[in-house]
């Protein structure tokens, strides 16, 4: 499909236009019409009802929901995607509440500073949805996309969305969405592109502590960071003053390898090799909580069970329902930005780390391989990393 740049979509929204926002194929894999409440024109909701044909909802921030005492529609939300519906509403000035103009009045009242909870009748014909506070960086839904887009256009944190259905009542996807885009002259973006746009703008790590850390491989400084998005704790082991081009090892936590010296992998040996290199040449190790390439400790142990039954490290993850590698390097890039590191000599054998850093604006100027000895227990694992995952070993 042909997608537009986020900046072009923002400009369209500020002109009062609707845009199409497409989510991931592993999620709903659908397109929603999205408009910003503050900027939408008088025909927006009528267009959504006539051409979109889906349920018209009003994504809002948590603060707006609290302001108007909009409580969850149900006590126990069993929606497959966790969509946070509140009780439906009509503005007191509307007639039946269902007309496009009544729903437009209700939506606009949600961003009126003078509106009060008493101005809304419940239930009604407009369905507010409460967005997660960290937007698409926390939940990749159309609800969060609409509120994030509103904020990016400097508008009140509220929007209007409607699923796009075909004339036969089926959901529009793929080529059907592209045809809809061209038929109506709309901009179309993906939630994935909005996530990346937000990550580029995000400063979500905060330094919490800094201490001296003597180790078997030299004396370092250890920095403790916290992600404001996930509340994860990240440590950085550093030697010397940060440089514009820095020696950097991005190491994914491996309890079994780093702590218990498991011979199933090469993680512990790579960490020790990196510490020796950084102690001699200066630089930093960013230690990310990405156990099992992002699937977590217990799932990694479950993957080991499958490996004992004949799977390799890639097919085991796939058999458990995960991608082969779930890691993202947004937080690593944020930490490098904190230290004003613009480019790196990356201590790694993994090309995906080069791509992951580049995606967030960090240039990989050079690479230093980390070569460690194989053993009888990790030979197949190392071979799979080389052949299936493209590791340069």
Curated annotation (Swiss-Prot):
Its cofactor is Mg(2+); Mn(2+); Zn(2+). One of its GO terms (cellular component) is cytosol. Gene3D superfamilies: DHBP synthase, GTP cyclohydrolase II. The record marks 125, 163 as: Essential for DHBP synthase activity. Residues 201-393 are annotated as: GTP cyclohydrolase II. Pathway: Cofactor biosynthesis; riboflavin biosynthesis; 2-hydroxy-3-oxobutyl phosphate from D-ribulose 5-phosphate: step 1/1; Cofactor biosynthesis; riboflavin biosynthesis; 5-amino-6-(D-ribitylamino)uracil from GTP: step 1/4. Keywords: GTP-binding, Hydrolase, Lyase, Magnesium, Manganese, Metal-binding, Multifunctional enzyme, Nucleotide-binding, Riboflavin biosynthesis, Zinc. Binds 2 divalent metal cations per subunit. Magnesium or manganese. Binds 1 zinc ion per subunit. Signal peptide: none annotated. Zn(2+) binds at residues 254, 265, 267. It catalyses: D-ribulose 5-phosphate = (2S)-2-hydroxy-3-oxobutyl phosphate + formate + H(+); GTP + 4 H2O = 2,5-diamino-6-hydroxy-4-(5-phosphoribosylamino)-pyrimidine + formate + 2 phosphate + 3 H(+). Mg(2+) 2 binds at residues 28, 142. Residues 1-200 are annotated as: DHBP synthase. Mg(2+) 1 binds at residue 28. GO terms for molecular function: 3,4-dihydroxy-2-butanone-4-phosphate synthase activity; GTP binding; GTP cyclohydrolase II activity; magnesium ion binding; manganese ion binding; zinc ion binding. Its EC number is 4.1.99.12, 3.5.4.25. PANTHER family: 3,4-DIHYDROXY-2-BUTANONE 4-PHOSPHATE SYNTHASE, GTP CYCLOHYDROLASE II-RELATED. Catalyzes the conversion of D-ribulose 5-phosphate to formate and 3,4-dihydroxy-2-butanone 4-phosphate. Catalyzes the conversion of GTP to 2,5-diamino-6-ribosylamino-4(3H)-pyrimidinone 5'-phosphate (DARP), formate and pyrophosphate. In the N-terminal section; belongs to the DHBP synthase family. This is Riboflavin biosynthesis protein RibBA. It comes from Staphylococcus haemolyticus (strain JCSC1435). The lineage of its organism: Bacteria, Bacillati, Bacillota, Bacilli, Bacillales.
